[in-house]
Design a protein with these regions (language model features):
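GST-like domain detector, emphasizing the conserved glutathione-binding G-site
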Residues: 1-122
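Non-transmembrane alpha-helical segments in soluble domains
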Residues: 67, 71, 92-95, 136, ...
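Hydrophobic/aromatic-lined pockets within catalytic cores
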Residues: 71-75, 110, 170, 174, ...
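Short, flexible loop/turn segments with low-complexity composition
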Residues: 83, 154, 200-204
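GST-like fold's C-terminal all-alpha helical module
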Residues: 98-187
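C-terminal end-helix/capping segment
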Residues: 180-201
Length: 204
C-alpha cells in the first residue's frame, strides 16, 4: 500500500503511525498538496490528503475511513480501540475532540497562510479560535485521572490522535495556546512523542 501526503498534516501523521502499529506494510510518499499539485493529482485528482492506495489499486480518502479499513486488514491482531461499549465510547469521544482540535487548527493555518489579509473575516477567525480553545479544554479534561503508561504495544487510537493533534497545534500555531494551561495534554503528548513509532514519523 502507498500512503500519500505530508507528515506536517495531522491526518496523514495519525494514519502513518497507526498503520505501523497495526503492522501493515506501506510506503509513505510525502507529496505536498500545495507545492506538488500536479504530482499529487496523478495519485488522486480530488487532491485530498491522506490518500491510501490499496493493493488492488483502490484509493481511499479521509483518515478515519482509512483507519477503519486498516483495522479490518489487521484482522484483530492488534486493536487500537477497546471492544467494550463504555470504553469504546470514551475512546471515540477523545478521538472526536482531538480531530476537532486538528480541524480548527488547520482552518486557522489556512486563514493565515492562504487567504489574503484583506479578505479575512475577523468574526469567523474568532469563532474558529473559540472552537479550538473549547476542544483543548474538553480534551484535557477527558484525559484527567490515572492511566497506564503509553507503550507501542498498548497505545490506543485516542492517545495517538490526541498527541498528534497537540503537537501539530504548537508546531503550526506557536504561542496561540498556552501549554501550561493544559498539563494533561502536554504530559500525554510528550510521552507519546518519545515512542519510537512517533519519532519514525516526525512532524517535521
Amino acid at each position: 500500500m502507498q500512503l500519500i501526503g505530508m507528515l506536517d498534516s495531522p491526518y496523514v501523521r495519525r494514519v502513518a503511525i497507526s498503520l505501523r502499529l497495526l503492522v501493515l506494510p506501506f510506503e509513505l510518499r510525502q507529496i505536498s498538496l500545495f507545492r506538488e499539485v500536479e504530482r499529487f493529482r496523478s495519485f488522486n485528482p480530488v487532491l485530498k490528503a491522506p490518500t491510501l492506495i490499496c493493493l488492488d489499486g483502490q484509493r481511499l480518502m479521509d483518515s478515519s475511513l482509512i483507519l477503519d479499513y486498516a483495522q479490518h486488514l489487521a484482522c484483530g491482531s492488534r486493536q487500537l480501540r477497546p471492544s467494550g461499549h463504555a470504553a469504546r465510547a470514551t475512546a471515540l469521544s477523545r478521538s472526536g475532540l482531538a480531530l476537532a482540535l486538528s480541524e480548527k487548527a488547520v482552518q486557522l493555518v489556512y486563514e493565515r497562510d492562504l487567504r489574503p489579509e484583506e479578505k479575512r473575516h475577523a468574526p469567523w477567525q474568532q469563532r474558529v479560535e473559540g472552537q479550538l480553545r473549547a476542544a483543548c479544554g474538553a480534551l484535557d479534561k477527558a484525559w484527567l485521572g490515572p492511566r497506564p503508561p503509553l507503550g507501542e504495544d498498548s497505545i490506543g487510537q485516542d492517545a495517538i490522535d490526541t498527541a498528534v493533534a497537540w503537537t501539530f497545534l504548537h508546531f503550526a500555531l506557536p504561542g496561540l495556546i498556552e501549554r501550561r494551561n493544559y498539563p494533561t495534554l502536554e504530559a500525554l503528548a510528550a510521552e507519546a512523542e518519545a515512542l519510537s513509532v512517533f519519532r519514525d514519523y516526525p512532524l517535521a
